[in-house]
Amino acid sequence: MAKAAMIKIKLLSTADTGYFYVTKKNARTKTEKLSFKKYDPVVRKHVEFKETKIK
């Protein structure tokens, strides 16, 4: 069987609230770490979310 291209990642809030999103990325084409500005409902603002491993 072939190795799956899509892997699950966790996008963790940089506001240190502990809030996170879970998404998928193609590990073969996107080798760099992802970073998005998304909504954090704990601080009720848009903040940067950075990629971390799912434990």
UniProtKB/Swiss-Prot annotation:
Keywords: Ribonucleoprotein, Ribosomal protein. One of its GO terms (biological process) is translation. It holds the Pfam family Ribosomal_L33. GO terms for cellular component: cytosolic large ribosomal subunit. PROSITE patterns: RIBOSOMAL_L33. InterPro entries: Ribosomal_bL33, Ribosomal_bL33_CS, Ribosomal_bL33_sf, Ribosomal_zn-bd. The keyword Cell cycle does not apply. The keyword Ribosomal protein applies. GO terms for molecular function: structural constituent of ribosome. Belongs to the bacterial ribosomal protein bL33 family. This is Large ribosomal subunit protein bL33. It comes from Beijerinckia indica subsp. indica (strain ATCC 9039 / DSM 1715 / NCIMB 8712).
